[in-house]
């Protein structure tokens, strides 16, 4: 049967599949539009499965507030330009909206999708992989909800390269609505994005991290010819410096290095008439810790030619 160009165009607009695939789908289903959508979905899901072993190390970080709840996620793709795709951005918006309404316990991808209970959240990624043509994965997610004595703030840097979420507290509930506290949260979130602290205070840095650093510093000092009896004292000073450089409250404030972040908290506290604290924070940097795959170009071309 003859398939009209208009019907092919409508199917393409609905599914975002290629023109030839849409034509094949309509021919295979005798022009039944809904059956053609399902045919493409099945074909797309098959294509998505083939992409499962690819490495997704690009993408973007997204951070948003939904009322008093903040959500930060990292979604990975195979190439950086996909993060600018409208479909990719729409996927991120839907995922953030879903996570703001649910808990993060267990496998979040197995959760019934909040906007359509006939789907699981993971189905959105399978469909996006098929539609966009690259492996799309949810790598990590975090969610904070403010209390009567705290506020949550999110900050995005560099078009989704770094996302920060922070919860700051005030000792008096009435101080939470003071604009100065929100400004403090924004300033500290920006600082965290720039300076990448390990923890809020030295007490929160794991003992094994400090122990490992001591080992490295001791070995370096021995290697440089320092006297063994002096090394312990030298390393103690170096560890103090290490902690100061990696603890948020002890770091020089990025917008005014003459004061520490802890000094900024005290200053804002005086302004709003309440003790101000940083309760927790999370910082996602795109692709951090992912080993990117590097292919031999000649081998890649040879592999592609096998299919022709």
UniProtKB/Swiss-Prot annotation:
Keyword terms: Cytoplasm, Elongation factor, Protein biosynthesis
Chain segments carrying region Involved in Mg(2+) ion dislocation from EF-Tu: 79-82
Keyword Cytoplasm: yes
One GO molecular-function entry: translation elongation factor activity
Keyword Lipid biosynthesis (UniProt): no
Function: Associates with the EF-Tu.GDP complex and induces the exchange of GDP to GTP. It remains bound to the aminoacyl-tRNA.EF-Tu.GTP complex up to the GTP hydrolysis stage on the ribosome.
Classification via PANTHER family: ELONGATION FACTOR TS, ELONGATION FACTOR TS, MITOCHONDRIAL
Protein name: Elongation factor Ts
Originating organism: Bdellovibrio bacteriovorus (strain ATCC 15356 / DSM 50701 / NCIMB 9529 / HD100)
Protein's gene: tsf
């Amino acid at each position: 049967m003859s398939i009209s160009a208009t019907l092919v165009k409508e199917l393409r607009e609905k599914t975002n599949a290629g023109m030839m695939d849409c034509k094949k789908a309509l021919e295979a289903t005798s022009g039944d539009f809904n059956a053609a959508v399902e045919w493409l979905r099945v074909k797309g899901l098959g294509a998505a499965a083939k992409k499962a072993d690819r490495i997704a190390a690009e993408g973007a970080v997204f951070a948003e507030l939904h009322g008093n709840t903040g959500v930060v996620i990292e979604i990975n793709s195979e190439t950086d330009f996909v993060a600018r795709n409208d479909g990719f951005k729409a996927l991120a918006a839907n995922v953030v909206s879903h996570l703001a309404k649910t808990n993060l316990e267990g496998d979040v991808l197995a959760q019934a999708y909040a906007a359509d209970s006939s789907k699981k959240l993971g189905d959105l990624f399978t469909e996006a992989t098929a539609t966009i043509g690259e492996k799309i994965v949810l790598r990590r997610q975090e969610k904070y909800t403010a209390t009567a004595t705290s506020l949550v703030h999110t900050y995005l840097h560099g078009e989704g390269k770094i996302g920060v979420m922070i919860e700051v507290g005030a000792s008096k509930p009435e101080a939470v609505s003071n604009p100065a506290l929100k400004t403090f949260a924004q300033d500290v979130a920006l600082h965290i994005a720039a300076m990448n602290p390990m923890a809020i205070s030295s007490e929160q840095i794991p003992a094994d991290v400090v122990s490992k650093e001591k080992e490295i510093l001791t070995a370096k000092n021995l290697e440089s010819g320092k006297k063994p009896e002096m090394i312990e004292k030298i390393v103690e000073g170096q560890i103090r410096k290490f902690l100061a450089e990696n603890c948020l409250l002890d770091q020089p404030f990025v917008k005014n290095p003459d004061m520490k972040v802890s000094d900024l908290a005290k200053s804002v506290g005086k302004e709003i008439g309440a003790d101000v604290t940083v309760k927790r924070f999370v910082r996602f940097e795109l692709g951090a810790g992912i080993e990117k795959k590097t292919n031999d170009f000649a081998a890649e071309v040879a592999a592609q030619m096998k299919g022709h």
